[in-house]
Amino acid sequence: MNPYDAKDRRWILSMFFFVVLFCNNVSTSSSSSEVITIKPRHLSLLKSALQRSSGEQSDLWRPLTDQGWSPCIDLGNSPSLPDKTAGYVQVFLDGGLNQQRMGICDAVAVAKILNATLVIPYLEVNPVWQDSSSFVDIFDVDHFIDSLKDDIRVVRELPDEYSWSTREYYGTAVRETRVKTAPVHASANWYIENVSPVLQSYGIAAISPFSHRLSFDHLPAEIQRLRCKVNFQALRFVPHITSLGDALVSRLRNPSWRSNKEQKNVDHLGDMTNPHRRQEPGKFAVLHLRFDKDMAAHSACDFGGGKAEKLSLAKYRQMIWQGRVLNSQFTDEELRSQGRCPLTPEEMGLLLAAFGFDNNTRLYLASHKVYGGEARISTLRQVFPRMEDKRSLASSEERARIKGKASLLAALDYYVSMHSDIFISASPGNMHNALVGHRTFENLKTIRPNMALIGQLFLNKSITWVDFQQALGEGHVNRQGQIRLRKPKQSIYTYPAPDCMCHV
């Protein structure tokens, strides 16, 4: 039964318009010099969304049917590893967690191609995320090494004779053992022709930069499957991430968790994950909302914050990219009609409501720092009052080990996302791509927004709620997790079929 009757909905609606008026006089700022007003941009649609009837579509939460594809990464009777390898391969990975994740998979593949021993990859500190977490802080290194013991040799650290080969060593001068010319999406032959000689001469090769440095095409089937084995089996988060993730999933599925917590003040991680206390598990969806300042600035789109916001984002764009942003040459209307603008929290709320999610939906918000803060999120929260995130679900004690660590926070969001009934992302990106591929591999429902269609619908300021719902529904019939075969140049990490899945 919907706890919000007609009287309650009228009260919520009246409070919403009070907030709108209030927001006109309240500013958010990412620095003391910025004064940016945030207010809803799609008032007509928002009014309809807040007044929508309760009760969701009967097939909304229905799992995907068997599509005739299953995981297929068994490498079969692989030949035993040679007694001696060609040397040691190091890689230095930049980017955020999921870009680094893909780089790790590529590093294993390159080590296999070269018959080399892989040193546990070094994770660079990203200037945006500012997290110094290492591989062993994020991933279960023992599981990683054990999972790959029949495929390649992996070592935690270099032997003493090569201990000089460090990040600092390569940052101070040109070194013969550093390979820095690997092209984007390099072929297997490129590595054999250019890295093998370095291994033969020095016994070690350090490849940097390495992100996106291995082709998705023209590779042996066993190399492709090895990449998927790393991604879907060998890379497992450290126990404290999976334990906390399991606790959050349990709380999302337990509708009485919060009232029980308030009444009994029970221990979060222990009592509330006790299987004997569980009721019939509920369903929940995950919304991945990548709406950070760097993404908003790089998109060059208008997000309704007025002249102050435009100037602020333009200044940030100049500071980070020195004006080298392709989107800057297009108008906001052109960018939106092409689907090149990330969706705001408000727009994602309208999108989910139009798909049929009602205000009883348990929605988990997977995000880092939303540009505009709570003022930007407030509209989404009004449409989905039962929205949660890692901060609302976990105690401060539970969050202590991951506080301020963007990669560990992203790992927790990734884990919860993989255990949700439905996943949807507000914009393309590495986390979106990684989760789409992983959930495809596991045959889990994943809504892939048609960004161009959505952008065009939001440009139509006179569109009715009924027409908005109908257009979205028709435009996403085949975008809910159906298998899509990888095309040339597409990522195996986003499209694991047919390379890593077998058609039964």
Swiss-Prot record:
Presence of keyword Cytoplasm: no
GO terms of biological process kind: fucose metabolic process
Pfam families recorded: O-FucT (PF10250)
Keywords per UniProt: Carbohydrate metabolism, Fucose metabolism, Glycoprotein, Glycosyltransferase, Membrane, Signal-anchor, Transferase, Transmembrane, Transmembrane helix
Residues spanning the membrane: 11-27
EC number assigned by the record: 2.4.1.-
Keyword Transcription regulation: no
Subcellular location: Membrane
Record's GO cellular component terms: Golgi cis cisterna; membrane
Glycosylated residue positions: 115, 359, 460
Major enzyme class: transferase
UniProt GO molecular function: glycosyltransferase activity
Family: Belongs to the glycosyltransferase GT106 family.
PANTHER family: O-FUCOSYLTRANSFERASE 2-RELATED, O-FUCOSYLTRANSFERASE 39
Protein name: O-fucosyltransferase 39
Organism: Arabidopsis thaliana
Organism classification: Eukaryota, Viridiplantae, Streptophyta, Embryophyta, Tracheophyta
